[in-house]
Amino acid sequence: MEEIKKIPSRDQIPAEDKWAIEDLYPTDEAWEAELAALAESQKTLASFAGRLGESGETLYAYMEAFEQVNAKGDLLGNYCMRRADEDTRNATYQAMAGKFMGVAVALNAACSFDTPEIMAISDEKLAQFYADCPKLERYRRYLTNLRRRKAHTLSAAEEKLLASAGEMSQAPDTIYGSLADADLKFPDAVDVKGNKHPLTQGTFVSLEESSDRVLRQSAYENLYGTLASFKTTTAAILNAQNKQLKFFAEARKYDTAFEASLDATNVPTSVYKNLIETVHQNMDKMHRYVRLRKKLLGVDELHFYDVYTPLLKDVDKHIPYEQAKQTVYDALAPLGDDYRTILKNGFDHRWIDVYQNEGKRSGAYSAGTVVHPYVLLNYTGTLDSQFTLAHEMGHALHSYLSNKHQNPIDADYVIFVAEVASTCNEALLMEYLLGKTTDKKERAYLINHFLDQFKGTLYRQTMFAEFELNIGKMAAEGQTLTADVLCAEYKRLNELYYGPDMVVDDNIAMEWARIPHFYYNYYVFQYATGYSAAIALSRRILREGAPAVKDYLGFLSGGCSKSPIDLLKGAGVDMTSPEPVNQALALFGELLDEMEELTRE
């Protein structure tokens, strides 16, 4: 591993390696002017109160105004939030993000009447509205999906009250983000020669991938030791998150926050529970993988600071960003020329914020807009960074195609399908890399990475999902989620998932405190279901070619025009069945067989 250099400040990053945020608004002043105009829109929206049941024309006029306000709000929110993520210490953009949130909450309150009024329209009357006003068909999917949750919609006054509490409900996530990304400082990690390496949330995984075990252990103990010193605070934040989810779920007459969260995107709770059950049935493969890793590393004890380092050190190499882009472009050839033309456009026109800088948000994400998507990376030159590029551009092109082919109100796909688009790219990249090498060591190195993807995406994310489900149950039963409660449950699950060959210590019991997804409302299971669907789809694309690509691009262009389950069925995968998860885990077993064979001495 190359020695990590000092993390640059934002102004030291070349312009070509920063996203083109000016494509949204040329200046902060232009953004301020547009935000002021958006704030005025609440008067227009509020003027429709009490009138949505009058006629099809009135309902259409309101929906049109609502759609336009949401489209403008999307651009405004993206600008200030992307700016804030460039340097989380920058008070200007933190303030702008707060100002935007205030306007967004006011707009939500101003149109809080719409859901109860739309729910109050009878089926017969709404059918007449469509007949009288053909333009209203544009919003049929949206209105149908909204009315699906009629039993969980409150009176206009109650809806307004809940809407006005929206900003307050975001407090746990906001506070956690400020603590994790801006305020937490970690001691430098020290390598076997005594050299110091900057330790941040962003550099942690790169340090854990080092072949230097002393450095890995130092980074691991310094990160989790620091988190442990804040465990009372982080537990209180996560407890508050679960309390607010419980409050809103009960207010809307759901039995649990779990049911409320999944119903919001029309995904059956059985899909979540089937995932956990199916993974439990395949836990022997994960334990076998852990045993193999322990054997290949040649250690007496396998610790959690040993799980990221590549097993074949002499194949490990730095991948320059330009090379990573070309490799991803070449690997996605099975998706066709149209797909790759859009991909190259994104590479060439600064959709991506590439490198880490001081204060930059850790991790990676893609944010879609009607202008073009924005992708945040913290690229470090590892094989994992290359896969992250493929992953996030999968999200980006999904957003681009949905925005191109759907009305704004139908373009915003749900997370359940989002992870399919990103992970399919990763699966195609892996197939491409494996297909290019006959070298035994390089093949073993790549298969190791593929196995690590299964471990990290299917097993690990399912463990996160099970943790989230279990602590949600505790909160629902009135239990306070103290640090001791959270650590005990997290440690128990690590012992279950990693098995007897892994040392599960008190450090890893603190890992829940560095997982931001626990503030995303039963989100993480979709990484595992998405990975399973993506494995199935990537194999269909490689096997069948054009017909499968046509179905897949239709899926990517679908936005939220159908339920997520139906969109995936159209692409060729049924996620109500355990079959896709079983298929993916069967492949994991086959790869494990080959890895054992390739590394047998």
PLM feature segments, named:
Residues 1-314, 598-601:
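A well-structured
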Residues 12-15, 22, 26, 118, ...:
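C-terminal, non-catalytic "cap/extension" segments appended to globular domains
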Residues 253, 380-400, 422, 427, ...:
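Active-site recognition of the HExxH zinc-binding catalytic motif
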Residues 296-334, 340-341, 398, 445, ...:
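Long, K/E/R/D-enriched contiguous segments that form extended
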Residues 317-319, 352-371:
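Catalytic zinc-binding patch centered on the HExxH motif and its immediate surroundings
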Residues 317-319, 370-390:
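Short pre-active-site segment immediately N-terminal to the catalytic Zn-binding motif
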Residues 330-341, 367, 395, 399-407, ...:
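Conserved helix-loop functional segments at active or binding sites
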Residues 413-442, 450-452, 456, 530:
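Post-HExxH zinc-binding segment in Zn-dependent metallohydrolases
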